[in-house]
Amino acid sequence: MSKNYDDLSFVTRAIHVGNDADPATGAIEPAVYMANSFLLPYDASQMNWSASEANIYTRNGGVNQGMLEKKIANLEGGEDCVVLASGVAALSALFFTKLKKGDHVIFSTVTYIATYRIFNELWNDKWGIETSIVDCTDLEAIKKAIRPNTKLIHFETPGNPTLCICDIEAIVKLAHEHNILVSADNTFSSPYNTRPIEYGVDFVVESLTKYINGHGDSMGGAVIGSHEDMEKIRYQAQVNIGGCISPFNAWLIQRGCTTFPLRMQVHNDNALAVAEWLERQPCVSFVAYPGLKSHKNHELAKKQMKHGFGGVLSFGLHGEHDLYNRVVTHLNIFTSAVSLGNAASLIVFLGEDDERMYLYPEEFHGGFYRVAIGIEDKNDLIHDLKQAFEAEHLETVD
């Protein structure tokens, strides 16, 4: 008997959707189905080999993948979902399926490095897809960039790493007036804070590696949209190109989902506290975080980010290049590493040689930190930053 989760809260659905007891064993938690093939029926010729619900071969889909897809689609408010090996695999699967030679794509000046390279380098050269890099916080700039062959507008919520905020509803309205599809990478916000489908976005992409898994021990990505489009992505991109998620990674992410809402609220609260403290420090040149009242898109962020502003912030110091590296050596709690959404806080210095730097606001041009705030005690995090600053004789205040 299928269960009805429609009236349940986000927190409850994160625990229960896709976590039904195993009918064969009675186990109340999902097993890991480490099989690459599944038993065929008596007459396999009568099967629909491309059906998503048919367990045939793990590249087509599997038990753990299916359970996770059900949960992610529900949490995002989407009709269906395809889970893949990584966030970049999810992005590539979407673009590969929906775009063709001669199409034009508008993408934001602030995007993840792999997305930037896909659109700015690979797709132009290899596939003949035209692209325009546009400040997607500027609706007039998007309007001017639209061409007769524009097929897709892609942006992030918020943007990585400047934390800019795009007006999702306004972009969707403009795009759909011109029969253009809209995709949003929601990784920095997560479905706990923002569900872009509620604003009319056609496709949402998530790096499940980040907040939704939350433990820094697996990789996965998801595309969420209509059932019709997800079936095309499964068949065209997952089955025929690859990029399928491993059963164990799907299981780890499914497990992470159960505590995801609780962790996400702590990420939100901690990041706001750290951002507010950083903004008061004389040694800090700027702080980019949409939860700050000083952020130019703060009011829009409040409208779109229902429960908080995410766990990532960026900031700069008054000082030269190597000061950033020296400060990091004094940190005890923060780990110098890429990624985000882990229980532990991470920090990375992005120097002046970042290939996207020319697209960022001027305050970023001298280099900056991108900080992924974890779920430690916020006072411990602030104290760790304070002592690291003071070790380099930087002025701080409480």
Describe each region flagged by the PLM.
Residues 53, 219, 253-256, 309-313, ...:
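Short amphipathic alpha-helical segments
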Residues 121, 144, 148-151, 263, ...:
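PLP-dependent enzyme catalytic core of the Aspartate aminotransferase-like
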Residues 284-369, 373:
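Conserved C-terminal alpha-helix-loop-beta "cap" of PLP-dependent enzymes
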